[in-house]
């Protein structure tokens, strides 16, 4: 019996030894089943790609944190290990497959798996290694997953690396067949740069999503433009600025981007940033909670939990105020005397056009408060009743005096026009922008990646194939003004106008007159709405061949989705 017992003991010991030193790591608990999304390139079209990104955003975004109606990712402290990752399964036409792991805290690719092996970036965390691909052989890469490290491995920047369906298919093949023993880090890093931008970055920015959708539709590759690369690089800082912005969207710091020609773009407010980037998801930053009347603020600044970390409130922001027809609000003649009126004037850098927005609700220039009385003027803040110096700036550009409920209005579009207070009718003459007072020239891309256009021979607004050629017989470039108007860039006296305020009313081009039916808001859900009618621009489904544009109730359909794009692809 002793001999038998000894033999059994040795057998058990040998089995245990094999388990410890086997090819695969052992884990005491069963692997966590993370949610997943899939994208198959075999017969994919742009709509399937769009739905894939929508599904991915839905699984990555947890909770209800929002800033200016944009979803904010949860901080690491609020995410359990069992909810930490989302898996993205990619398949190409050659039936090669790879699975990416996305961290829901950063929306970034942290590892990938193929067959029975998985690969983690250098410096991977314990949470990643203990929860991802635990039933595979895990291997470490000898470089990190940030852009600097990946570009160093490739030997050049991602500005030279094409994106599109062909590049994605090749990258899936490269990742699915990668072996660390081969040591082809250059090819691996290049493939990772492609999938990171076509998955993570496209989910973060609808601007990037649109460019990739167009490349899928046209079966053409493209290289990232400098605006696209700069928004990728600045996602963290722009997320922070948005979450700490004042209620009207003014930033404390400038977000510095680049245009396609490498010219700097200084962005000082949320409205302009969204028009440029169509950012769809924000990285978590400590939130500032500001309570404002619901009837004034349409988009909440931040909705967070009670135990969220709080940012220090930005006490003051000094910016110009842009308004009707591109004029700026200024203290008349730069006169500092109490009672000096506020007027419209050509925008400049003079001190009497600089306005300081404070958290106490005051707006000051030349050391005096913007004050409501029989007219709009500046006055000693300590002399007049406090309620006459309080203002609320809405994200749609309305500036309201809460006591009276009246709003700043520019009765005429002319130099020297005195600013008045009037009942809010959501008119373009009542639209303002804090900072970024210069119009943004852009294409407006909508249904099936077609561009909003007008023909100089009539006043119709329709959709057409996007063209960057100056010889085109139609106008597809638009100037987005701070007063909320959308103007024909070749003739900025002409505005996009709804014929009425009811559903199915056509949208046309008329002379800019500061009307309510000439004011528009680019919303974070992708719609362009008219604040007065609360209806949105809609491609008439009954008239798609003619591509007629009408007003309609919001429905969430693709023919109500628009994006401002300085590059129409």
Curated annotation (Swiss-Prot):
Record InterPro entries:
Ribosome-inact_prot_sf, Ribosome_inactivat_1/2, Ribosome_inactivat_prot, Ribosome_inactivat_prot_CS, Ribosome_inactivat_prot_sub1, Ribosome_inactivat_prot_sub2, Ricin_B-like_lectins, Ricin_B_lectin
Q: Which EC number(s) does UniProt give?
A: 3.2.2.22
PROSITE patterns assigned to the protein according to its UniProt record, in alphabetical order = RICIN_B_LECTIN, SHIGA_RICIN
Answer yes or no on keyword Repeat. Answer: yes
Q: Name one GO biological process term.
A: defense response
2-alpha repeats (start-end):
448-488
Question: Ranges for the Ricin B-type lectin domain?
Answer: 315-435, 437-565
The positions flagged as active site in the entry are 201
1-alpha repeat ranges, renumbered to this chain? 325-365
User: Where are glycans found on this sequence?
Assistant: 40
Q: Quick one: signal sequence residues?
A: 1-28
Q: Keyword annotations for this protein?
A: Disulfide bond, Glycoprotein, Glycosidase, Hydrolase, Lectin, Plant defense, Protein synthesis inhibitor, Repeat, Signal, Toxin
Spans of 2-gamma repeats, please give.
Answer: 533-566
Q: Which reaction equations make up its catalytic activity?
A: Endohydrolysis of the N-glycosidic bond at one specific adenosine on the 28S rRNA
Annotated S-S bridges:
286-311, 328-347, 369-381, 451-466, 495-512
Q: Which family does it belong to?
A: In the N-terminal section; belongs to the ribosome-inactivating protein family. Type 2 RIP subfamily.
Q: What does this protein do?
A: The A chain is responsible for inhibiting protein synthesis through the catalytic inactivation of 60S ribosomal subunits by removing adenine from position 4,324 of 28S rRNA. The B chain binds to cell receptors and probably facilitates the entry into the cell of the A chain; B chains are also responsible for cell agglutination (lectin activity). Agglutination is inhibited by Neu5Ac(alpha2,6)lactose, and N-linked glycoproteins such as fetuin and orosomucoid.
Q: How does it assemble?
A: Disulfide-linked dimer of A and B chains.
What protein is this chain from? Ribosome-inactivating protein SNAI'
Q: Which organism is it from?
A: Sambucus nigra (European elder)
């Amino acid at each position: 019996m002793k001999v038998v017992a000894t033999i059994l003991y040795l057998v058990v010991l040998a089995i245990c030894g094999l388990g410890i030193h086997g090819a695969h790591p052992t884990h005491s608990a069963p692997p966590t089943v993370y949610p997943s999304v899939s994208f198959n390139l075999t017969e994919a079209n742009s709509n399937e790609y769009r739905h894939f990104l929508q599904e991915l955003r839905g699984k990555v975004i947890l909770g209800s944190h929002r800033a200016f109606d944009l979803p904010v990712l949860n901080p690491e402290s609020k995410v359990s290990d069992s909810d930490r990752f989302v898996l993205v399964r990619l398949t190409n036409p050659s039936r090669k497959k790879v699975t990416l792991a996305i961290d829901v805290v950063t929306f970034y690719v942290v590892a990938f798996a193929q067959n029975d092996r998985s690969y983690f970036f250098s410096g991977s965390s314990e949470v990643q290694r203990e929860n991802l691909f635990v039933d595979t052989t895990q291997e470490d890469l000898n470089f990190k997953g940030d852009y600097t490290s990946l570009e160093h491995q490739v030997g050049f920047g991602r500005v030279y690396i094409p994106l599109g369906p062909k590049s994605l298919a090749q990258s899936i093949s490269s990742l699915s067949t990668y072996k660390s023993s081969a040591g082809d880090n250059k090819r691996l890093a290049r493939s990772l740069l492609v999938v990171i931008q076509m998955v993570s970055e496209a989910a973060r920015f609808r601007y990037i999503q649109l460019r990739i959708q167009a490349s899928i539709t046209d079966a053409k590759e493209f290289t990232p433009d400098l605006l696209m690369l700069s928004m990728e690089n600045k996602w963290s800082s722009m997320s922070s600025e948005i979450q700490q912005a004042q209620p009207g969207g003014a930033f404390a710091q400038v977000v510095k981007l680049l245009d396609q020609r490498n010219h700097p773009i200084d962005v000082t407010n949320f409205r302009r940033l969204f028009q440029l980037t169509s950012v769809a998801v924000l990285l978590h930053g400590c939130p500032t909670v500001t309570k404002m009347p619901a009837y004034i603020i349409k988009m909440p600044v931040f909705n967070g939990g009670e135990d969220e970390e709080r940012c220090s409130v930005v006490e003051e922001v000094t910016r110009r105020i842009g308004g009707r027809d591109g004029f700026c609000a200024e203290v008349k003649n730069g006169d500092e005397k109490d009672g000096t009126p506020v007027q419209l004037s050509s925008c400049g850098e003079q001190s009497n056009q600089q306005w300081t927005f404070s958290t106490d609700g005051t707006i000051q220039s030349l050391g005096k408060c913007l004050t409501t009385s029989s007219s709009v003027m500046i006055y000693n803040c300590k002399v007049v009743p406090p309620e006459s110096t309080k203002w609320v700036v809405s994200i749609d550009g309305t500036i309201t005096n809460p006591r009276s409920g009246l709003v700043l209005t520019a009765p005429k579009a002319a130099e020297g026009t005195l600013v008045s207070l009037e009942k809010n009718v959501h008119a373009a003459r009542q639209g303002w922008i804090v900072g970024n007072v210069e119009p943004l020239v852009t294409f407006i891309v909508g249904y099936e990646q077609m561009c909003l256009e007008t023909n100089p021979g009539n006043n119709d607004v329709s959709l057409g194939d996007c063209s960057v050629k100056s010889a085109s017989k139609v106008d597809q470039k638009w100037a987005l003004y701070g007063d909320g108007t959308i103007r024909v860039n070749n003739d900025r006296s002409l505005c996009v106008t709804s014929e009425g305020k009811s559903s199915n009313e056509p949208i046309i081009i008329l002379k800019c007159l500061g009307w309510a039916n000439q004011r528009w808001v680019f919303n974070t859900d992708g719609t362009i709405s008219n604040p007065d009618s609360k209806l949105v621009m809609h491609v008439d489904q009954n008239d798609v061949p003619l591509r007629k544009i009408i007003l309609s109730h919001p429905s969430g359909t693709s023919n109500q989705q628009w994006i401002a794009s300085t590059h129409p692809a």
